[in-house]
Amino acid sequence: MNVFEKIIQGEIPCSKILENERFLSFYDINPKAKVHALVIPKQSIQDFNGITPELMAQMTSFIFEVVEKLGIKEKGYKLLTNVGKNAGQEVMHLHFHILSGDKH
């Protein structure tokens, strides 16, 4: 079980931003910007290559809700995901980073 699965199961605490039945968003413990959030599906998906178009549409809507809640929609932000170890993916569970446009 990876660290994100342990967070989903409640075995590891996190600073939740938003949660619904399919997704969870929380603050990154090693922020790279003033605002650095993660968005993960509760379903076990290794990376972006494993997501279905339907789930991606739902995740996109959830990400928009998180951005609104963080108050960074108008100020600008970065949205990224790393796919595979060679691209820098450290946790083998699909996750998106939301980073405010300003540097930490």
From Swiss-Prot:
Residues 3-104 form the HIT domain. One of its GO terms (molecular function) is adenosine 5'-monophosphoramidase activity. CDD domains: PKCI_related. GO terms for cellular component: cytoplasm; cytosol. InterPro entries: Histidine_triad_CS, Histidine_triad_HIT, HIT-like, HIT-like_sf. GO terms for biological process: D-alanine catabolic process. It comes from the Bacteria. It holds the Pfam family HIT. A motif (Histidine triad motif) lies at residues 93-97. This is Uncharacterized HIT-like protein HP_0404.
